[in-house]
Amino acid sequence: MSPICAICGQGIAPADDSKEHILPNAIGGRRTVNNFLHGDCNNRAGQTWDAELEKQLRPLALHIGIKRQSGKTSRMKVTTTANEDFLLDVGGQLEMVRPVVTPTLLRNDERIDVTAGSLTQARETLKGLKRKYPKVDIEAMLARAESRRSYATGAINIDLSFGGPLSGRSVVKSALALAHYAGLPIEQCGDAVSYLRKTDAEPC
């Protein structure tokens, strides 16, 4: 008897099988199971249910530095109580959303001051400035760059709540995948299976 897909309820042929992370890779999951989801069902759930869960948990994943098995957690824009905009990066680090370019007209020439969140951002900014100011020597300016550490003036307010029909199904799918990994037939988990297969099912 062929295994049954937890989402669509159809048999899984060897060619249609897929590796499913018990916890989504996007939030640091490593262990996988087979004979649990069709490849198509796996992809659809990943693009909807798991994507929503990752979006809701991204602030926490960035703050504590979750390492994915593959890929990298995307930075996210945050605003402080002082209305400062930053990008939250891995480990809770903050980076400027956009660089600040300040041209100053001197007696014989024009001076350009660039404040950027990283050397990479500074380099990209200087490349853009070179189109307007061809005499800009990117490498010379980077060699004279000064590194300074500064802190946000305001506090960052991050919503760590999660739930809803999409991320909720991702959580239930993980619980069902763990049961499958432990050798429990998924059809014995009636409420969980019903929740994954029926859009109007009651949350379990």
Where does each model-flagged region fall?
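Short recognition patches in nucleic-acid-associated and regulatory proteins
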Residues: 14-26
